[in-house]
Amino acid sequence: MADSLKMAGLSLEDSQHAPSHATGRAPYIPPHLRGQQRAGPTMPVDGAAPQGRPPMNPGSWGPNGAPPNNWAPRGANNINGAPAWGAAGGGGARFDPNAYGHPGHRGGQSHGGAGSGAARGSGDGQWRDGKHIPGPPNARLERELFGVPNDPSKQHTGINFANYDDIPVEASGHDVPEPVTTFTNPPLDDHLISNIKLATYKTPTPVQKYSIPIVMGGRDLMACAQTGSGKTGGFLFPILSQAFKNGPSAVPTQNANQFSYGRQRKAYPTSLILAPTRELVSQIYDEARKFAYRSWVRPCVVYGGADIGSQLRQIERGCDLLVATPGRLVDLIERGRISLCNIKYLVLDEADRMLDMGFEPQIRRIVEGEDMPPVNGRQTLMFSATFPRDIQMLARDFLKDYVFLSVGRVGSTSENITQKVEYVEDADKRSVLLDILHTHGTGLTLIFVETKRMADSLSEFLINQNFPATAIHGDRTQRERERALEYFRNGRCPILVATAVAARGLDIPNVTHVVNYDLPTDIDDYVHRIGRTGRAGNTGLSTAFFNRGNRGVVRDLIELLKEAHQEVPAFLENIAREGSGYGGRGGGRGGGRGRGANATRDMRRMGGGGPPMSGTPSYSGGYGGGANNYGGSYSSAPSYGGYGGGYGGGSYGNPSGPTGPSSWW
């Protein structure tokens, strides 16, 4: 074989990459070092064949390929948050597996190999020596988060915000803080105010005017505000502002030694936001990224229907503010990847919809069955467009000494929305819809149907009629739904056909027209559907197709139209007088889940009898046993009486509580 190689001009004794030595053999050069040897000394060899793994570059590695003693991990890189190894240079922080990814152990550390490098967080800010140090501006990220002027995919302040000063606001509870009128310090942090300015928000909405001082003052809150009124900012602004001022929390010592494969295995968020749908949690997460820009706070989002591996990797890089759907959060808790022991803020957004969708067992497990601090050890905020009586009664288990906030005619509809109701038989709906689209062809149009099959069928029909349309419903994959929403937002497909999955909470900017192709069977769903337009102070148009198949909601619909000062068609009045239309879900106005005139009222002040009140009076006849005595222990279910007349007039006592039977309402 050697002879044949020599015939070809090759030799087993020759090397094409290094000079020959006296022994006649050339040293082995690892592929990653070839071409670099001329710049440094030749690696010594003893003439014997290399044994074991080849030696590494002596200028970079210590004995046996191990890092030398002066090496320390640099801070998280900008790609995936993993440690980047490099020379410490005498000033770098030593690697501490107990601190990696734990925000509570970052104080006083320099997030870099030699006192430099980017810090962990959504905006590359730092918390160092008890101070919040914002990161440098990032033009590309700013364009991604905040858009550019006149960006159609971003919602900006509406033209009717000036009229919000005339909207009535009801705040019940003792010692309600005075509302704020501008985004200033105090009470907000300067860095948050700078991000609010980047978002071109100039004036707080009514819910924000009250929620900011309430949450900053340490109170629990139940907020009932009109759809599109800025509820997301109502809880994000005070939570992030407190985080920027107070810094991260330390991880409990019993959990500080959890470290696996160079990463923190379990996340310890300080804020938890629960919402019912994938679209809503994604929307809240996007807003959190926006207002946490250049800060030390790192938001994360988890939801079902998406790759759990990528979500786990996101959490492992650090998670200070977690936005989640209840089901996926329970899954991650069971996997041991998330602990709730550090939670300071719990937010339930669209709380009534979460219960409607059957999430109550998961919510109770998250709040009461895991390691989340008890009601007195955290702040709890509930936000939604409606809070029927049973939801308010549920609040007794989750909230303490809370302020009930009702802004405007919530549970009704916004006057910013012009509502039209047309009598259309089922067979004529498609032709009438085409007429409407030809008449109101500009802007984004959102069409609601009742079934997934109808969503696909109607979108295909519109495409065949040369209308650019797309559809979204529960059977579509998460990627298909996200793509459809993106095409709709940027105007590529200005017509979106949707089932109820997109009706609640989605903040789709600049929707000018909502069409209820199929009316829902519950009036609350109608309220939330048409609330997709007329958001953030802008005006909008709503058209509903009505026929006798919808007579179950006729009385509720008439009342809503009157409350919003809209025209009531004569055919609605006629059908209502026929006597067959009284009800809706639950068999009548105020039936079902308790909607009606009291759906936006503080149930602590509603009448109803029950045992006499007890405890020290604090507001309108007694709050019921003092601020800290309502509710009971988490070890047994509370026994409760009627909710009585007056604030604290009824009894929601729990014999297992600290002072015996105490009054709830």
From Swiss-Prot:
Stretches with biased composition (Gly residues): 106-124, 580-595
Superkingdom, taxonomy of origin: Eukaryota
Domain Helicase ATP-binding: residue ranges: 212-405
Positions of short motif Q motif: 181-209
Domain Helicase C-terminal: 416-576
GTP-binding listed as a keyword: no
Pfam families registered for this protein in UniProt: DEAD (PF00270), Helicase_C (PF00271)
Subcellular location: Cytoplasm
Its EC number(s): 3.6.4.13
Position of sequence motif DEAD box: 349-352
Catalytic reaction equation(s): ATP + H2O = ADP + phosphate + H(+)
Family: Belongs to the DEAD box helicase family. DDX3/DED1 subfamily.
The protein's name: ATP-dependent RNA helicase DED1
Species the sequence originates in: Coccidioides immitis (strain RS) (Valley fever fungus)
